[in-house]
Every structure is written in structure tokens, then in C-alpha cells.
Amino acid sequence: MVKDFYHQHVVEALIKDGWKITHDPFYVPIGNRRGYIDLGAEKSIIGAEKESNDGLQQIAVEIKSFISKSDLNDFEGALGKFQLYFFALEDLEPDRILFLAIPLGFYNRFFNDTFFTKLIRRANLKILVFDEQDKTVNLWIK
């Protein structure tokens, strides 16, 4: 399995943000086939507004680099992959939240278009925006 260009950047950003990487990659059965979400991670939650039943928040992260010549083609592929993994994960681990990790540079140039900001809401897309230079998490869009 080939890792995305920014794979290690996202791993480091999540660790800096207090997450423990539990799966690299995270295997997900898709029908009779195998799918691999880039990462699985968990974080102990402290504080009332983030508390869950067992005090643990679990996520899966699909990383996309968006470094080809066409942002739109990259996004179409990422959205399709996100939806496929979302439905597979819903059956396997319904409490684990799936995020699409995207670089800050791509986020700034692509999501200034209201069409795509509406699409995030309509498609229930969860996004983790990471700074590809600092290797930090900049924004969680839930």
C-alpha cells in the first residue's frame, strides 16, 4: 500500500495534538474486499464537553495530499473514498469518526468557494486541516 505524500506529517500532527496512533493503516472490510483507511487513532477525553461514555474518542483518518494538477479531480476521488469508508466503518465501528485530512494550503484555496463549503455540510464530511509545514492540526471541521 502506497502512503500519501503527507502521511507522516499527519501522524506527527495527530501525536502533537494528543492522539495515539492505533492503526497504520486501519483495515476495513468493504463487502468481500479489503479497504485500508490511512490511520486509526484514539485520545483520552478530559472535560465535560468532550466526554464520551468510556472517556475515549476514536477516529479514522483518510489522508489526501492534493498535489496533482487538478484539485477538482483529487477532491472527487477523495470524496468518493470518504463515502465508501464512511459506510464500511459505520458497520464495523459506528462510534469511530472518519475524517478526511487535507493540507492547509489546499483548504485555503479550495474551500473559499461557497459551493464546496455547502458540500461539506450536505455530505456530512468531517475534515482535519493540517499545516504541512509545521506538522500541526489547524482545524477540525465536524
Residue ranges and their predicted role:
Residues K20-I59, D74:
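Active-site metal-binding core of divalent-cation-utilizing nuclease and nuclease-like domains
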Residues I63-F75:
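Short beta-strand-loop-alpha-helix junction that forms the active-site gateway
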Residues L72-D95:
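Basic, amphipathic alpha-helical patches used to engage nucleic acids or provide basic targeting signals
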Residues D38, L139-K142:
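Short, surface-exposed amphipathic charged segments that create phosphate/polyanion-binding patches used
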Residues V2-H7, V11:
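Nuclease catalytic cores
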Residues R121-W140:
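Charged, structured surface patches that assemble and position nucleic-acid processing machinery
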Residues F87-I120, F130-E132:
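Nucleic-acid nuclease catalytic cores
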